[in-house]
């Protein structure tokens, strides 16, 4: 669109924005073609349940976001449309999945290893009796 002649149907000031919008739509179209090239069942069979939930949530969020953009292009305020509540609901579930993922990644305490580490890391001074016995043993040799 950069080499094309500017259409007089809209103000020149928004030409860059329209070009960027058109490029973004093209990128979304390519991404969706890639996602749609594999059947949903085929894709989900390869994933564990948490990954399946992520795919479902991203798909739902993408679809609703695209509807948001559609409403905006039609002159409808999407902030006053039920799609806003749907996007918020999906965002809440995405946060729940993120919390679960973070808990799985969090370090777990190995009590045995921690106990050995602390026991060996703490320095204990030898008692006076033990050092006298050690000195007597050295002098007799």
Curated annotation (Swiss-Prot):
The principal localisation class reads nucleus
Q: What switches on its expression? A: By gamma-radiation.
Which GO terms of the cellular component aspect does the record hold? cytoplasm; exosome (RNase complex); nuclear exosome (RNase complex); nucleolus; nucleoplasm; nucleus; transcription repressor complex
Give the Pfam families listed for this entry. Answer: Sas10_Utp3
Please list the tissues where expression of this protein has been recorded: Ubiquitous. Expressed at very high levels in the hippocampus, medulla oblongata, mammary gland, thyroid and salivary gland. Expressed at high levels in the fetal; lung, liver and kidney. Expressed at low levels in skeletal muscle, appendix, heart, lung and colon.
Tell me, in a sentence or two, what this protein's role is.
Answer: Plays a role in the recruitment of the RNA exosome complex to pre-rRNA to mediate the 3'-5' end processing of the 5.8S rRNA; this function may include MPHOSPH6. Can activate PRKDC not only in the presence of linear DNA but also in the presence of supercoiled DNA. Can induce apoptosis in a p53/TP53 dependent manner. May regulate the TRAX/TSN complex formation. Potentiates transcriptional repression by NR1D1 and THRB.
Q: How does it assemble?
A: Monomer and homodimer. Interacts with NR1D1, THRA, THRB, NCOR1 and NCOR2. Associates with the RNA exosome complex. Interacts with EXOSC10; the interaction probably mediates the association with the nuclear form of the RNA exosome. The homodimeric form interacts with TSNAX following gamma-radiation. Interacts with RAC3.
Can you name this protein? Nuclear nucleic acid-binding protein C1D
Q: What is the lineage of its organism?
A: Eukaryota, Metazoa, Chordata, Craniata, Vertebrata
Encoding gene per record = C1D
